[in-house]
């Protein structure tokens, strides 16, 4: 009965959606440990969690990302493929007893049909309940859209992605990290920038850097602008500043916050 009610709510939400805004605009507490769960969107380019932890290590003197930021990924996976309950058990990953924050990243195809979106909504709810049962805060990672070289490209796909993640975030009262909207904003400003691989789906290095900046701004509630980390010189000073500003602007716009960056 509970599943039927949840499915009905998801269907009603998608059928009546107009412009929606996220209801949760910040985490309850600043995390000291973070687990990313997802697929190749996370592990490409030396893994997003490594870039995120290097940014956090630089900005926060007492943050120990090497010890407390981890990633569990399966190539090509959707949310349903992850055994979240096992991953968040004490010492299931390294020596960490309990993560403060678990970030869930869904598969890119989970937005392509109504049945896919319903399954995403149901699975996200199940995982979020599992995470909360361990007194861990959950969050959702909004994925980016495909580019034209991908067979499933559609000009307005990002709107469907935005709606699906925002609705799920509001339904479950969790923070949504607007990575997909940051990609959209960056391409609007600099259409020539290479955020995707040639396959039109996976992130290139600059896309991963932008995603890490967006996660940083969302999770910590602080601007990434001014962070020196550039992946050992692999991100130019111009691109670094541009992506940092885009990430913060996207977060401000999505959460309805004020800010000059």
Question: Where are the predicted features?
Answer:
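Conserved SGNH/GDSL esterase-like catalytic core that processes O-acyl groups on lipids
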Residues: 33-35, 42-121
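N-terminal signal peptide c-region/cleavage motif recognized by signal peptidases
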Residues: 13-15
């Amino acid at each position: 009965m509970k599943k039927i009610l949840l499915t009905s709510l998801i269907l009603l939400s998608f059928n009546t959606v107009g412009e929606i805004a996220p209801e949760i605009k910040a985490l309850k507490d600043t995390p000291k440990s973070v687990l990313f769960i997802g697929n190749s969107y996370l592990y490409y380019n030396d893994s997003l969690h490594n870039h995120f932890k290097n940014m956090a290590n630089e900005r926060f003197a007492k943050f120990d990302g090497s010890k407390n930021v981890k990633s569990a990924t399966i190539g090509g996976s959707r949310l349903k493929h992850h055994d979240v309950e096992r991953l968040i058990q004490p010492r299931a990953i390294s020596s960490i007893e309990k993560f403060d924050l678990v970030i869930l990243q869904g598969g890119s195809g989970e937005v392509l049909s109504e049945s896919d979106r319903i399954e995403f909504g149901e699975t996200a709810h199940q995982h979020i309940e599992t995470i909360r049962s361990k007194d861990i805060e959950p969050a959702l990672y909004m994925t980016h859209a495909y580019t034209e070289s991908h067979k499933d490209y559609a000009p307005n796909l990002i709107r469907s992605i935005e709606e699906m993640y925002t609705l799920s975030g509001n339904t479950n009262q969790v923070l949504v990290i607007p990575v997909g909207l940051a990609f959209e904003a960056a391409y609007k400003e600099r259409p020539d920038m290479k955020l995707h691989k040639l396959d039109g789906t996976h992130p290139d290095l600059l896309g991963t850097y932008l995603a890490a900046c967006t996660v940083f701004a969302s999770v910590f509630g602080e601007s990434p602008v001014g962070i020196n980390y550039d992946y050992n010189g692999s991100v130019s000073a111009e691109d670094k500043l541009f992506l940092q500003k885009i990430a913060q602007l996207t977060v401000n716009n999505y959460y309805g916050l004020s800010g000059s960056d």
